[in-house]
């Protein structure tokens, strides 16, 4: 049987692709030699019998002329039988082929996905091994040899195998090789709908046991297949299902996947191969009529589920809105306004409700007790009638919703508001110009001592004193009996400082923040020290003036 040369192998695949045609040819040659040896023994026996019966040389020459023709028929028959037994044995192995293949039958090369990957998803060349997998999708190059014994052998066909893509295939499917037995436009015979299921009579896709083509696939395209491909490796007790992509002829033409649908499914699984879930297929490879793709079938359910959840609070809100708004009974003043409003509008040319209500309010207060008692009696009757009409009503029904909305809006901002309100009176958050410009408003009522801040402001050293007070260090707490004053007080403030020292009150020119009322009384030395330490905690400026304690 002819073998492929090296040039033919380079044309069929890439340099790193494993194509072993020589070993396959040698194995087939060995098989053919064994068969011919057995037939040679039979021929020798038959020739001996014929020579014993016919002792003429003419009969021997006739038998030698007749032998080649039956031998050719026997060779083709034995060849076909071996082919089917080999295919059956390989099918029982689980769809993966361990022995070499015939040279005329190309095979699918799928890399071992357990090996390490490169960063871009392709397999590393050093660690690349291949799994030989059946591709039960397209035509059989040697199928014509079973129909016609005069057809060329697969070895002759494999030299002319073009690597093209079927016209009816989806662009996502990888490149396949097929023999020139079928043109690209015509589908092969085993994919035509003439193949009927003997039980159901429905056109079906042939089972992998009936097909035996192996199609080469470049490792670069398979390198992008994601690792957890459970549909590639058959589980125990499961058969290998054909992959039904958008380009292959579907057993049910109405359920065939178009290009958009197959692209949608391919985006969920793999950029090159579009698997069909095995649970949607029968044992014969026929998809269930109600299932096209489980992914597409689940999307409407996912879209319908959120509205179901959102509709549950909807009826409650609608029921609350449908409840009639019950007005509260009118009080005496409202009854008076209802009666006198038309008169006021007729007397005055005012159209503003605020002005009209003001006039009505003045007139209501000008009424005597007897006149008002009449309206109070009407209001009491109004309340009784309202309680009879609406026994379970309360004013909270009308105001509960509004208060609840206000609470929901204010829950997030209430802690910040309280903290800001407490910090607003603090002088440290105000600019220093405002502190100096308006000392009387913030500090005038703080201390009831003879030394008021106004007397301190009258001196030229007052601004420096405020700055020094803001820069008081924490070491002031070490000497509780003594209080820092200016090292050189001016003559104008000497009387105030002496009077303050005799009274025992601290005389800082300006305090950094207002004091509570509990500290307005003359404090003890301990309270004074705590007060100064508390104010010193809020100061951030460095020490600018050296202060000395006065004895």
UniProtKB/Swiss-Prot annotation:
Gene Ontology CC terms? beta-catenin-TCF complex; chromatin
Q: Which CDD domains does this entry report, sorted A to Z?
A: HMG-box_TCF7-like (cd21996)
A GO molecular function annotation here is:
RNA polymerase II cis-regulatory region sequence-specific DNA binding
Locate the DNA-binding region by residue range.
326-394
Give residue spans, biased composition: Basic and acidic residues.
19-32, 63-76
The keyword Repressor belongs to this UniProt entry's keyword annotation: yes
Biased composition regions of type Low complexity, renumbered to the chain: 46-61, 449-468, 493-505
* Gene Ontology annotations of biological process type: brain segmentation; canonical Wnt signaling pathway; cell proliferation in dorsal spinal cord; embryonic pattern specification; endothelial cell fate specification; generation of neurons; heart development; hindbrain development
Q: What does this protein do?
A: Participates in the Wnt signaling pathway. Probably binds to DNA and acts as a repressor in the absence of ctnnb1, and possibly as an activator in its presence. Regulates anterior-posterior patterning in the neuroectoderm by repressing posterior neural fates. Also required for hindbrain morphogenesis.
> Know the name of this protein?
Transcription factor 7-like 1-B
User: What gene does this protein come from?
Assistant: tcf7l1b
């Amino acid at each position: 049987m002819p073998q492929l040369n090296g040039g033919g192998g380079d044309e069929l695949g890439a340099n790193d692709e494993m194509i072993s045609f020589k070993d396959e040819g040698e194995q087939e040659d060995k098989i053919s030699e064994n068969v011919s040896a057995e037939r040679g023994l039979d021929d020798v026996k038959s020739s001996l019998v014929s020579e014993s019966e016919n002792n003429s040389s003419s009969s021997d020459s006739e038998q030698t002329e007749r032998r080649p023709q039956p031998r050719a028929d026997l060779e083709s028959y034995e060849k076909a039988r071996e082919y089917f037994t080999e295919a059956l044995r390989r099918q029982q192995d689980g769809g993966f082929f361990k022995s070499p293949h015939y040279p005329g039958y190309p095979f699918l090369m799928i890399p071992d996905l357990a090996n390490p990957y490169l960063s871009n998803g392709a397999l590393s060349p050093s660690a690349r091994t291949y799994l030989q997998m059946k591709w039960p999708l397209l035509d059989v190059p040697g199928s014509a040899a079973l129909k016609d014994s005069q057809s060329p052998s697969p070895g002759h066909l494999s030299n002319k195998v073009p690597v093209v893509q079927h016209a009816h295939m989806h662009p996502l499917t990888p490149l396949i090789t097929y023999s020139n037995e079928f043109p690209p436009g015509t589908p092969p015979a085993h994919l035509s709908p003439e193949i009927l299921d003997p039980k159901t009579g429905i056109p079906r896709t042939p089972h992998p046991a009936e097909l035996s083509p192996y199609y080469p696939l470049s490792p670069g395209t398979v390198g992008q297949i994601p690792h957890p491909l459970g549909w590639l490796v058959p589980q125990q007790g499961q058969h290998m299902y054909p992959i039904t992509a958008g380009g292959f002829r579907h057993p049910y033409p109405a359920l065939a996947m178009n290009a958009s649908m197959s692209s949608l499914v391919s985006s969920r699984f793999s950029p090159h191969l579009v698997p069909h879930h095995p649970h949607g297929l029968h044992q014969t490879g026929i998809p269930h009529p109600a299932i096209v793709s489980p992914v597409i079938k689940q999307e409407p359910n996912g879209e319908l589920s959120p509205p179901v959840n959102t509709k549950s609070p909807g009826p409650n809100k609608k029921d609350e809105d449908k409840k009639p708004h019950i007005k509260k009974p009118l009080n005496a003043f409202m009854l008076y306004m209802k009666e006198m409003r038309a008169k006021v509008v007729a007397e005055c040319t005012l159209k503003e409700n605020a002005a009209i209500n003001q006039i009505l309010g003045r007139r209501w207060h000008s009424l005597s007790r007897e006149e008002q008692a009449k309206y109070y009696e009407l209001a009491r009757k109004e309340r009784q009638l309202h309680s009879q009409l609406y026994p379970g009503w309360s004013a909270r029904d009308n105001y509960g919703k509004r208060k609840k909305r206000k609470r929901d809006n204010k829950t997030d901002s209430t802690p910040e508001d309280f903290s800001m309100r407490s910090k607003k009176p603090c002088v440290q958050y105000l600019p220093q110009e405002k502190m100096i410009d308006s000392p009387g408003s913030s500090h005038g009522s703080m201390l009831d001592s003879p030394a008021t801040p106004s007397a301190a402001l009258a001196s030229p050293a007052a601004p420096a004193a405020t700055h020094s007070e803001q820069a008081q260090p924490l070491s002031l707490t070490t000497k509780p009996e003594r209080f820092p004053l200016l090292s050189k007080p001016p003559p104008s403030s000497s009387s105030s400082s002496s009077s303050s020292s005799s009274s025992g009150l601290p005389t800082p020119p300006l305090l950094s923040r207002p004091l509570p009322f509990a500290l307005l009384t003359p404090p003890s030395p301990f309270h004074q020290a705590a007060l100064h330490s508390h104010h010193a905690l809020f100061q951030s400026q460095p020490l600018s003036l050296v202060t000395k304690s006065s004895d």
